UniProtKB/Swiss-Prot annotation:
Biological role: Porin. Binds peptidoglycan.
InterPro entries (UniProt xref): Bact_OuterMem_StrucFunc, OMP/PagP_b-brl, Omp38, OMP_b-brl, OMP_bac, OmpA-like, OmpA-like_sf
Record bears the keyword Acetylation: no
GO CC term, one of those recorded: cell outer membrane
Subunit structure of this chain's protein: Homotrimer.
Boundaries of every OmpA-like domain copy: 221-339
Broad class of the protein's primary localization: membrane
Annotated localization: Cell outer membrane
GO molecular function: porin activity
Gene that specifies this protein: omp38
Presence of keyword Membrane: yes
Annotated protein name in UniProt: Outer membrane protein Omp38
Top-level taxon of origin: Bacteria
GO biological process: monoatomic ion transport
Length: 343
């Protein structure tokens, strides 16, 4: 009876332990059981010995199971054999053998790792409880005890949900100490799909942050303006440029070269000494003297330079004094223009 309790405990505990595994159902198993003739006819094989003979007959069963791993499963099984009972002296006597089993099976996937194969051989080991009910009242009407199962078989997969199942099984009766043998077949149904090994963890290479490409700031287009003045002073009745003013003329030339679109307006002036006609010519000559220096010495385009003489009409000082007249003998030039620069 101790083995019987162990078998029943396995029957209850294993499905609970695998509550999240794939569920298998074998709604009908058909086979043929061959009773041990040595038990039926031997001299010391148990309490049934020398009594009625159990005849071979049809095996019918059903099983409910769970897949514990992709290659290991557990099944709770009920089956029965109902056959003729000879040697009772009563024609038509029968026996009924019932079993409740808990069986583990391991498929070839344990070794091959070919989880998608169509044919899966397996081995089976388990234990259970049996009960005999006999029509012969001369002997024990009912007998029960513990049994062990060992078998080999194969699942023949039709698709992901259905498989044919064939098996050859030996069942050992611990209490009566005899074997019987069963060849059986059935249809195995998987609810929710077969278990498969977890997908391997793919190590993702760390993403190395790519340093952003330095973006050069967009160039700024700026406009620079040129506003410049030139003053050159002359001796009485002279139009030549004195050496002290030549550096100032050079600065104007440099600005005109830097600003290609710049222009210069050059104005000549005199004091009130002498006749007007003379001073008109002298004032223009002084303006042209500055223009000539820019063109001949610094290659400034003459078209960018305009000249005009004003005689004594625009004095900046009093012509009644020597100092005032010196201030009025002059050239005044304004240089204007602009250029576009990119920074």
């Amino acid at each position: 009876m101790k083995l019987s309790r162990i078998a029943l405990a396995m029957l209850v505990a294993a499905p609970l332990a695998a509550a999240n595994a794939g569920v298998t159902v074998t709604p009908l198993m058909l086979g043929y059981t061959f009773q041990d003739t040595q038990h039926n006819n031997g001299g010391d094989k148990g309490e049934l010995t020398a009594g009625p003979e159990l005849q071979d007959d049809l095996f019918v069963g059903a099983a409910l199971g769970v897949e514990l791993t992709p290659w290991l499963g557990f099944e709770a099984e009920y089956n029965q054999v109902k056959g003729d009972l000879d040697g009772t002296g009563v024609p038509g006597s029968e026996y009924k053998q019932t079993q409740i089993n808990g069986n583990f099976y391991a498929t070839s996937d344990l070794i091959t790792k070919n989880y998608d194969s169509k044919i899966k051989p397996y081995v089976l080991l388990g234990a259970g409880h049996y009960k005999y009910k006999l029509d012969d009242m001369s002997y024990h009407n009912n007998e029960e005890g513990t049994l062990g199962n060992a078998g080999v078989g194969a699942f023949w997969r039709l698709n992901d949900a259905l498989s044919l199942r064939t098996e050859a099984r030996g069942t050992y009766n611990f209490d009566e100490k005899f074997w019987n043998y069963t060849a059986l077949a059935g249809l195995n149904v998987v609810l929710g799909g077969h278990l498969k090994p977890a997908a391997p963890v793919v190590e993702v290479a760390p993403v190395v942050p790519v340093a952003p490409t330095p973006v050069e700031p967009a160039p700024q287009v700026l406009t620079e303006d040129l506003n410049m003045e030139l003053r050159v002073f002359f001796d009485t009745n002279k139009s030549n440029i004195k050496d002290q003013y030549k550096p100032e003329v050079a600065k104007v030339a440099d600005a005109l070269n830097t600003f290609p679109n710049a222009t210069a307006r050059i104005e000549g002036h005199t004091d009130n000494t002498g006749p007007r006609k003379l001073n008109e010519r002298l004032s223009l000559a002084r303006a042209n003297s500055v223009k000539s220096a820019l063109v001949s010495e610094y290659n400034i385009d003459a078209s960018r330079l305009s000249t005009q003489g004003f005689a004594w009409d625009q004095p900046i000082a009093d012509n009644k004094t020597k100092e005032g007249r010196a201030m009025n003998r002059r050239v005044f030039a304004t240089i204007t223009g602009s250029r576009t620069v990119t920074k």
